[in-house]
A protein has these predicted regions:
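Beta-strand->loop->alpha-helix junctions that form or flank phosphate-binding loops
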Residues: 68-69, 89-97
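Single conserved hydrophobic/aromatic residue that forms the stacking wall/gate
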Residues: 129-138
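Glycine-rich, highly charged phosphate/nucleotide-binding loops
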Residues: 123-128
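Short beta-strand scaffold segments in enzyme catalytic cores
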Residues: 101-105
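Divalent-metal (Mg2+/Mn2+/Ca2+)-assisted nucleotide/phosphate chemistry catalytic cores
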Residues: 117-120, 132
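Short strand-connecting beta-turns/loops that link adjacent beta-strands
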Residues: 96, 108-110
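Glycine-rich phosphate/adenosyl-contacting loop at the front of the ribokinase-like
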Residues: 2-86, 110, 114, 121
Length: 138
């Protein structure tokens, strides 16, 4: 099932989210240290990624402006964004950098350990060269 909104192509974006989009791997074992985790569930993550999905779910025409790797995790993120109705025409792909990953544990109510795997990752490569002329501020 595709949640894409039937927006008119000429309609301007309500929101363009720029920044981190990554893959979050949450440990399936709650209340267990990460070193004891046996399995993980994969989700779209990153502040900008989460906001683009949330606003799309609320009915806004949202776009994601970031970079992902051409690796399988980058393909996963692009597919998830599209599934959620987020416009990915501004989402760039780079073959030279891996998509960022985060491994997270869940120990409610106040402990949520996480490990970032973001060394020189794709979304950190975003720069002015990725902005096309129609997207640039006037």
């Amino acid at each position: 099932m595709n949640k894409s909104h039937p927006f008119d192509k000429s309609r301007p974006f309500d929101l363009i989210c720029m920044g981190r989009v990554a893959v979050d791997f949450y440990a399936d074992q709650i209340h267990s240290p990460l070193e004891h985790a046996q399995s993980f569930s994969r989700y779209l993550g990153g502040c900008a990624g989460n906001i683009s999905v949330g606003t799309s779910r609320l009915g806004l025409k949202s776009a994601m402006f970031s970079c992902v790797g051409t690796d399988d995790m980058g393909v996963f993120l692009r597919n998830q964004l599209q599934f959620e109705g987020v416009d990915t025409s501004l989402l760039r792909s780079t073959p030279d950098h891996l998509t960022g990953l985060v491994v997270l544990g869940v120990s409610p109510p106040d402990r949520f350990p996480l490990i970032f795997y973001r060394e020189n990752c794709a979304d950190m490569q975003l720069s002015l060269i990725h902005i096309s002329e129609p997207t640039r501020p006037r």
